[in-house]
Amino acid sequence: MLGKGVVDYTREGSILSAEQRRFYEKNGYLLIRNCVPQYELNRFRQRFQDICEKKVKAPENMTVMKDISIAKSEFKDGEKAITKIQDFADDPVLFEYCKYPGVVDVVKDLIGNPKSNLMAMHTMLINKPPDNGKLTSRHPMHQDLQYFPFRPADFICCAWTAMEKITRANGCLVVVPGTHKGVLLPHEYPKWEGGVNKAYHGIQDYDTSTPRIHVEMEPGDTVFFHPILIHGSGANRTEGFRKAISCHYANDDLCRYVNVEGTTQETLAEEIIEIAKKRLTRYGLDPNTVTLDFADIWRVRAREVNGRRSNL
């Protein structure tokens, strides 16, 4: 059972009912309707626009990404040119999402208790662009643990909030219930004709006929899911952009960094380390003289949500 000895999924939590906790334990995800109010979403949307239009200075460690199709399209500047921002934990407005009580209290019920110290490990605001026919806006089926050098997986949880109506048409999340009880599978870049965005790894030889659930959402709805749950998202076949905001949390009382050398994560870790080294030039450092390991990168990213940082 998930969280054995720490979380009792047969009992109600501070926020969640026993039925909701059992659903998460069985399926690896839980959808909470109206979790984040519209006025908060409006603030996050405005902040994203201000960052894209350079009306406010983005934190130095924030990553601003373009879809490979956008990089070659008519969208050169502003909100329509950006497909995602990552590592927004040092932005005072966007980080309020990670600390929003309606989200944090659910996470604590799933991977800890009311006194648990949580860390925000990975943050994203996704602006999925309209697909130009090459299907580059889709995300291959994957497991988030592929990217994380910390364990145990049962004490990591993603909160993913819709900032607008999200449907199959504009590329909602798809999940394969129960797969969180399996293991981390080997990942690689999909061999897609239209190309694949940087670090968009997918499960090797994945059977696309496997039944899946499409998680359609209204603004403010939030899906919480386990890092081994197999999931992905479809292409955005509408003319508009599709926004969502997310944070991966880890229970800092229980999680520790692990060495991924010699595992299925090693290749991706090397790729991310190389990306990080290239960014060191921003600070006047020679990347060839700096030694980094995968855990170092995550230590820099991680931020306290509550309590005092201890292990991560």
From Swiss-Prot:
GO terms assigned for molecular function: L-ascorbic acid binding; metal ion binding; phytanoyl-CoA dioxygenase activity
Matches recorded under Pfam families: PhyH
One biological process term in Gene Ontology: fatty acid alpha-oxidation
Keyword Cell inner membrane: no
UniProt: 2-oxoglutarate binding residues: K84, M124, H142, Q143, D144, W160, S233, R242
Cofactor(s) needed: Fe cation; L-ascorbate
InterPro entries per record: PhyH, Phytyl_CoA_dOase-like
Pathway in which this enzyme or protein is active: Lipid metabolism; fatty acid metabolism
This protein's name: Probable phytanoyl-CoA dioxygenase
Lineage: Eukaryota, Metazoa, Ecdysozoa, Nematoda, Chromadorea
